[in-house]
C-alpha cells in the first residue's frame, strides 16, 4: 500500500505518547493544514487535456477524444462508419453507396454531405463541457457563398459568422499554401483550423449555402475533447467585414466589441485599385474607452504583418539585374501567403492575402475594443494617397459571453469576388 502523508500522521497519532515522540497538537494541526492546501492545489492543477503542445504531450488526463464527420454526425463512441447502403435514397445518409456497392456497410458509405442553395446544415451539435481542438474540411464551390457559423452554450446569435474561405485565409477563392500555428491550408483545398475553442454547455456548428445556383459538396472532420474547462476560459469569436471599395480610406477591422477579452489576430484580403506601393496604412487599437486617439498605433501595414519595406527582397535575376517583386512568406504567427499578380487579360487586379496571429501577444481589453487600419499608398512627389481598395477581413478574438450582436452579413452579391 502506498503510504501518504495522511497515513504517516495517523500512525504517529496512534502511538502512545512518550517524552521522545510526543508531538504538540499545534504542529499536528499545521501539518494537516499544509497537506490539505497541497492536495487542493494539486486537484485544481490536474491536467484537463487542453492546451496541448510538445511540452505536455506526455501528460495523461481524463479527457475524452471524440470526432464528428459525415461518418459519425453525433461523435458518439462506437457509432462511426455505420451508414447503411439501404439508405442510399436518403439525402446525406449514404451519399457514396454507389461506389461502395460491391463492399457494403463499413466501406466509406458517407464521407461527404451536399448542401443545396439556401440550405443550412448542422455540422456539429455537442454537449459540453469540452473544446474543439481541430477542424478539417474541403468545401467545393464558391467559398464566399458558404457561411460558417458557431454558437456557444445555446446562444441564438453566432459567435463566429464568416465565409468559409475567409475563415481559413482564402478570401479570394483560390488556393495558396498557408502554414501557420492557427490555420493551415494544404493542397488542393484542405482547410485546417487549430484555434482552441472551449465551451461549457454546448457547441453548435453550421454551414449555410447562400448561393443561388450550385449545391455545395463538403467533406469535414471536427475533432474535440470532452473535459472540464477552466473558469477563466474565454469563448472564441470571429467576424467578417468587407468594403468594396473602402470609401473612407480608414477601414474598420472590428468595433462594437463589449466585455472582457483579448484580440487574437486578423486575416485580410486586399485588392488594390491604384499603382504603386499600397501598404503605408497604420493599424490602431482603441481600447477601453479610447475615442480620438488609440492606445496602440502601428507604423505601416507590412510592419504590422511582421514584414518590411514593401515585402520586397530586391533579388537579382539571371542577368544580374535587380528586380523588385513581392515575396510571399508563411511563418507560425504572420505571413503574406498569397499574391495574385493578374494575368493581363480578365484577371487584371493585384490582390493580396495576409495574416497576423497574436498567439503570444494578445491585445487585452476589459470593456470594449475597436481596431482600424488605414488604406494608404503614395502620390507622386512623396505625398500619401488615401486609397479606395477592395478590403475584406476576419477578426479573431476571445471574450467572456455575452457578446454584442454582429453587423448583418452582406448578401452574396456584395460578397462575390469579381
Annotate each PLM feature.
Residues 1-44:
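Bacterial Sec-dependent N-terminal signal peptides
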